[in-house]
Amino acid sequence: MNQVTIQWDAVIALYILFSWCHGGITNINCSGHIWVEPATIFKMGMNISIYCQAAIKNCQPRKLHFYKNGIKERFQITRINKTTARLWYKNFLEPHASMYCTAECPKHFQETLICGKDISSGYPPDIPDEVTCVIYEYSGNMTCTWNAGKLTYIDTKYVVHVKSLETEEEQQYLTSSYINISTDSLQGGKKYLVWVQAANALGMEESKQLQIHLDDIVIPSAAVISRAETINATVPKTIIYWDSQTTIEKVSCEMRYKATTNQTWNVKEFDTNFTYVQQSEFYLEPNIKYVFQVRCQETGKRYWQPWSSLFFHKTPETVPQVTSKAFQHDTWNSGLTVASISTGHLTSDNRGDIGLLLGMIVFAVMLSILSLIGIFNRSFRTGIKRRILLLIPKWLYEDIPNMKNSNVVKMLQENSELMNNNSSEQVLYVDPMITEIKEIFIPEHKPTDYKKENTGPLETRDYPQNSLFDNTTVVYIPDLNTGYKPQISNFLPEGSHLSNNNEITSLTLKPPVDSLDSGNNPRLQKHPNFAFSVSSVNSLSNTIFLGELSLILNQGECSSPDIQNSVEEETTMLLENDSPSETIPEQTLLPDEFVSCLGIVNEELPSINTYFPQNILESHFNRISLLEK
């Protein structure tokens, strides 16, 4: 009897299991009812109660049994009434379970199935975090991913919202983990807002909004490491060759490597251009197996490629000249970064070096041929020399010391000629300033025959000599050898009489007004009113000297008609009175009018400097001395 009962239990269990595998317990034809409190889906770790109520015809159940996943529960079962029982679970932690209950009826050899139900426990979704949308180069899709948080253990759905910032159009995409959105379906421009909403039976959460620009989320095509080689240089180095099919110009990459026995990655970063095959150099330990990975991103952007598949390379024990070897690739993505870089061409590795070597050989051969031609061909050598002489400046090959060709000598000669031409102008500016001026009076000297010889002529003259003597200022010109020291003095006041006729003749020079015609003697008509001592020079010398002073001083602009008349009179007296026997002091008196004109020539006021340059007077007095001799 017991064996029959066991067989019936096995048949019922197999039937239930078969029915569950083809549709679940919920498809069983129930002879009662089963329910779960608080719900069939609940938060993991809660206390739950499962109720079973029988509704079998012609059966008053003696016992009610609970099964979880095909295993009979023997504890925590409570009989509520004749047809109902309860199974209680504390801190239920199983994500999924299948529950059913049976009843023992009188006059039945096996348990009768009442009903069954699936229960689930889990968690509400976390807020989706780290929402990322990228466009892999050449894919044509925008791939959006996010961090879903902890596992919910129950069915959770995610809705991706994409809203255009330009057209305000919003699209929703239902998914369970990530989503690929065709770029052709994004017709709302380049700028979008993206956010993710997560929901399950226990709750709903929404992520933050992500603003994207379609041009900023492009990731270059994957980089691939192709081969490695170790070169025996001064210090052995390993070169890793890698490439990418990207069309993006500015790309930043990272390469990481480590020994297979090590857990720490070494990372190098660099910028590159995939016009050429990339070469990354490493100085590694010999006889050690290393692993390499690489990834890239568009320069200045946020998103990186996933790490490339693993590439293995073992450094040799004794480094040969060049060792090349390709290794298998393992697919493994994660990690850190690195690499220093030099570029090589897309052709073979040694082709660039061979081309450089051939170029150097051709250049050396051509140079040797040209050198031999220059040595044995004289005309060729002469032609080259002429062309070189035309190109280089003359001062590189002129005779040294050939001073006549020197530019410095020519410059000095030009400066010397310029100074000689301007010497007459420069001498006007180098004379010292006259700082001492004194007034003197001529002492009275009255010989015994003074009244007899000169009374008549003095009384018969119509010329107003008293006014001239009172108002005229003269300048004393001393001997040339002692320097020029002018002295200004006035004649004796009115009522004083000179005692010597010779003194009057030498100091006043008062001929008749009509004795000389200004039109017939233009050489003398422009001289100022001044007098010279006749004891030192003759009348001819005085005439020449006065003419030269006229040319130098150009007194026509400053001499008044009265002064010109006095000049004519004084010149006449110089020509008439040339007695060398008279003894008069060597002192020359110059009128103020003459000195005033000289001050104007020097562009200075006569009241400040009533003199003229000494060198000019010296030159003219030297000429007078020569005429005397």
Swiss-Prot record:
PTMs per UniProt: Phosphorylated in response to IL23.
GO biological-process terms attached to the record: cell surface receptor signaling pathway via JAK-STAT; cell surface receptor signaling pathway via STAT; cytokine-mediated signaling pathway; defense response to Gram-negative bacterium; inflammatory response; interleukin-23-mediated signaling pathway; negative regulation of interleukin-10 production; positive regulation of activated T cell proliferation
Localisation per UniProt entry: Cell membrane
GO MF annotation list: cytokine binding; cytokine receptor activity; peptide hormone binding; prolactin receptor activity
Residues bearing glycans: 29, 47, 81, 141, 180, 232, 262, 273
Membrane topology, from the record: Single-pass type I membrane protein
Intervals, Extracellular compartment: 24-355
Positions in the Cytoplasmic compartment: 377-629
Taxonomy, superkingdom: Eukaryota
Tissue: Expressed by monocytes, Th1, Th0, NK and dendritic cells. Isoform 1 is specifically expressed in NK cells.
UniProt name for this protein: Interleukin-23 receptor
Taxon lineage: Eukaryota, Metazoa, Chordata, Craniata, Vertebrata
